[in-house]
Structures are given as structure tokens and as C-alpha cells.
Regions:
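Macrodomain-like recognition of ADP-ribose-binding/processing modules
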Residues: 1-170
Length: 170
């Protein structure tokens, strides 16, 4: 039920802020916004010997299948326009699921410049090349905890690729 999920999301984000304010503030401060032209900055900072895995399971299950001391970066298939997607409205897609099991929403909601820019630059639903890198997001499942870095990035809306009329105005 979406009303239950919405109420749970509000409770969860408040609880995260109360219990993890210093960790959230640290992640917000160290988060980075990347837009077209900054890929060079990313590649300069890439460590050698990265291990990439594609696993057939949900993102948080994959995270907890790894050793607790693993340094992991997760991809958040995000809303281009809203931090945490429709989390506070009770939706439950991948972006919302990540927020329900972490303090990711608390970090993303502080990225007001990013979301102000993205809401003004929707490119008719095809969006722009942009992402947020958020380090050290704490995830919870059962009685376990695991930190992971998160890249929040939205894919273009497939329906807009074939739509002759823009869904959003610039």
C-alpha cells in the first residue's frame, strides 16, 4: 500500500537524520556533481585494479553478499528530477528501495543545486549527462550494516525518444 510506504519513508528519513546526522553531513559535504565535460576528472581519480561485477539480484542484496570491508560503488537508477524518486509518495522502484535501506535520501535531498539545475534542463525528457557521487552511504538490512559509495544517475525516458511532442518544456 503506497500510503503505508509513504508514512514509513517519512519515518525512516527522520530516524536516519536523528541517528546519523554526522555521517549524513560528511557524505553531503564530500558528494560531487558531475556534468558533461567532467568525465576526465572521474577517470583521473580512478584506482587501478577495479573489479566490476554484474550480479543477478537487487542492489542491496548484492551489497550484503560481499565482505563487510569491501569498498563498493552502487548505481542508483534515479529520478532526474526528484531526490529519492517518489520515495515520500510511497513508490518502490530501485531508487526508492535504496533509500528505504539507507540514509541515501537524506544525502540526496541536500543536493538542491543539482535538482534545481536538472529540473530546468530536462531536454524534453531525454535529460542531460549528469550524476551525483555520494560517498559512504550506510545501508541496513536485518541486523547488518554496510557502507557503499553511490552514483545517482538517471537514464533518458524511453518514451520521450519516440515522442514528437516534448513532455517537459525547457
Amino acid at each position: 500500500d503506497s500510503q503505508f510506504l509513504a508514512a514509513d519513508a517519512v519515518r525512516h528519513t527522520k530516524e536516519m537524520q536523528e541517528n546519523f546526522a554526522p555521517d549524513i553531513a560528511s557524505s553531503v559535504e564530500r558528494s560531487q556533481i558531475f556534468r558533461r565535460g567532467t568525465i576526465g576528472e572521474i577517470s583521473k581519480n580512478t584506482k587501478q585494479g577495479l573489479d566490476t561485477q554484474l550480479l543477478k539480484m537487487d542492489t542491496v542484496t548484492a551489497l550484503f553478499s560481499l565482505p563487510a570491508d569491501s569498498h563498493v560503488c552502487l548505481l542508483n537508477f534515479a529520478s532526474f528530477r526528484y531526490p529519492g524518486g517518489q520515495l515520500l509518495s510511497g513508490s518502490m522502484a530501485q531508487a526508492e528501495a535504496l533509500c528505504h535501506e539507507s540514509f541515501l535520501y537524506n544525502v540526496l535531498e541536500k543536493q538542491t543545486d543539482y535538482y534545481a539545475w536538472t529540473n530546468q534542463n530536462t531536454n524534453h525528457g531525454l535529460y542531460q549527462d549528469s550524476a551525483i557521487f555520494s560517498p559512504d552511504i550506510l545501508f541496513f538490512r536485518d541486523d547488518r550494516e554496510h557502507y557503499a559509495d553511490v552514483v545517482t544517475c538517471a537514464a533518458p525516458k524511453r518514451s520521450c525518444l519516440f515522442d514528437r511532442k516534448p513532455r517537459f518544456t525547457e
